[in-house]
Amino acid sequence: MKTKIILSTLLMLTFWCNAQTTDSALKEVQKIIEASNKTFSDFTNKNDGSIVARYTDDACLFPPNGEPKCGAKQIDSFFRGGPQVHVIFTIQNLYGDPKTAVTEESFYEMTDMNGKKLDDGKVIVIWKKTKEGWKMHRDMFSDNHPAKQG
């Protein structure tokens, strides 16, 4: 009986320690993603295609009310020529395997360069760990406002 109790305790400690490690690793990944999110609009505002480096080679962007944009050329085309804006992302949930891929659920608020609110909404991004670091693999977003009627 004593052996069973000891084994059960060791087993519980093993699971608990593993959960702590994963939790800690996810927090580290979240810090990396938050840093990337803080500079997102800087890259889109450059209008020079540098935003594409934030995505995996086989990434897809899923904008609202439009076809998916897959690959560097289409993603660059989507962002190029867009308005100068500032976007703040607030991560609500982050889950997955901190060694390979995680999913980010965030809210965003978009303002013009003078701070006037233009839009707000939600984002789901699947981040993939690459040899160059964490990159966006799938990026889907939509605003929080009803569709405008014709």
Predicted regions and their residues:
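Bacterial Sec-dependent N-terminal signal peptides
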Residues: 1-24
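Short, low-complexity N-terminal intrinsically disordered segments enriched in polar/charged residues
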Residues: 17-54, 147-150
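Hydrophobic pocket/interface hotspot
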Residues: 40, 51-52, 59, 71, ...
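Short beta-strand edge/turn micro-motifs at domain boundaries
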Residues: 122-147
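Surface-exposed, charged secondary-structure patches
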Residues: 76-115
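Structured segments of extracytoplasmic/periplasmic soluble domains
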Residues: 39-47, 54, 58, 78-82, ...
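A short gly/proline-enriched turn/hairpin at secondary-structure junctions
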Residues: 58-69, 80-84
